[in-house]
């Protein structure tokens, strides 16, 4: 009885662990989580790791004393902490919005990044683009979801016999070790595109790993007096709010980010309910995996090459 009363007195809150809050993608995920949590009468604590391993470890250790009713990771946990996350998941409901190819024994709302990369490549190939560039943040082992997206893109071009026609421009690893500024990813797109244009003007299309990078690409091209899509086509990924604005009208990939946030929260709610309604004193064990089919959104920044 005492234990039951203690459980009843626990504050109804969830913890969201996010790698940054500067990219609208994570803000959209958070919006989806928060809207569903609010409907269910839950509050949220947000832990921003800033892709710092020490910060991530510190937050994970804090969970034992905070004792939230659930934890949502808005990206894959760092590899060195996957064991800690699985241990937490055996005591507290945990859901991860992750890259489908990662091996993690917890509930997940999955994203097949390789498929996203293939979709981006297929769109450009169908338009007739043959010489293209891909602009990305650091492609490190810690950030496998980025590499998977690039790999999918290269695979599609490879199957068309054009893999050697793709230029990969990735930021240096130090970028992930610095605290992200509000314009960090935009700057990656802007600076790497300027570098690219100094090296070659042969490319007919430039892809940003995400929309924020693509915005930087657009500004660098505008500064170089190159027309989009007349001279160079540009493509992003995530279908963030800014991509939809009339002046930008960015071709991108929609993978239903807000819905994923809501689904991650729903998974936690189901786990909390099943924990509270034990069947013959045996807690049911279930694993949830949700995946959305991504959709190409063609707008005004991609067209046939000259």
What are these regions (language model features)?
Residues 131, 163-166, 228-233:
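Short acidic capping loops at alpha-helix termini that bridge into adjacent secondary structure
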Residues 109-135, 151, 155, 186-195, ...:
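Hydrophobic alpha-helical segments within soluble ligand-binding/sensing domains
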Residues 194-306:
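Flexible loop/turn connectors
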Residues 37-48, 154-186:
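Short beta-strand elements in bilobed, periplasmic/extracellular small-molecule ligand-binding domains
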Residues 120-162, 280-301:
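An alpha-beta-alpha
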Residues 8-122, 126, 198-201:
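Alpha-helical recognition/docking segments in bacterial nutrient-uptake
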Residues 1-10, 306:
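N-terminal helix-turn-helix DNA-binding module of bacterial transcription factors
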């Amino acid at each position: 009885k005492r234990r039951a009363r203690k459980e009843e007195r626990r504050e109804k809150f969830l913890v969201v662990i996010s790698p940054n809050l500067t990219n609208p993608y994570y803000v959209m995920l958070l919006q989806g989580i928060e809207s569903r949590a609010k409907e269910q009468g839950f509050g949220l604590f947000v832990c921003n790791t800033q892709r710092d391993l020490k910060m991530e470890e510190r937050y994970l250790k804090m969970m034992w004393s905070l004792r939230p009713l659930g934890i949502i990771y808005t990206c894959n946990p760092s590899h060195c902490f996957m064991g800690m996350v699985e241990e937490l998941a055996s005591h507290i409901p945990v859901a991860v919005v992750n890259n489908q190819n990662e091996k993690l024994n917890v509930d997940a709302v999955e994203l097949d990044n390789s498929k996203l990369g293939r979709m981006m490549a297929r769109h450009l190939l169908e338009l007739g683009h043959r010489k293209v560039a891909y602009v990305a943040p650091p492609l490190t082992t810690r950030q496998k979801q980025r590499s998977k997206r690039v790999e999918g893109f290269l695979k599609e071009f490879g199957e068309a016999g054009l893999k050697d026609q793709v230029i990969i421009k990735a930021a240096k690893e130090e970028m992930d070790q610095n605290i992200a500024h509000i314009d960090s990813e935009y700057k990656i797109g802007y600076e790497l595109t300027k570098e690219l244009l100094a090296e070659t003007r042969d490319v007919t299309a430039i892809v940003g790993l995400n929309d924020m990078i693509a915005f930087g690409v657009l500004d660098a091209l505008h500064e170089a007096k190159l027309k989009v899509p007349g001279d160079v086509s540009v493509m992003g990924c995530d279908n963030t709010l800014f991509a939809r604005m009339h002046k930008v009208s960015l071709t991108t990939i929609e993978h239903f980010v807000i819905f994923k946030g809501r689904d991650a929260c729903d998974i936690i709610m189901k786990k909390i309910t099943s924990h509270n309604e034990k069947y013959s004193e045996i807690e049911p064990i279930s694993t949830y995996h949700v995946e959305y089919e991504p959709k190409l959104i063609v707008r005004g920044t991609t067209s046939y090459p000259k």
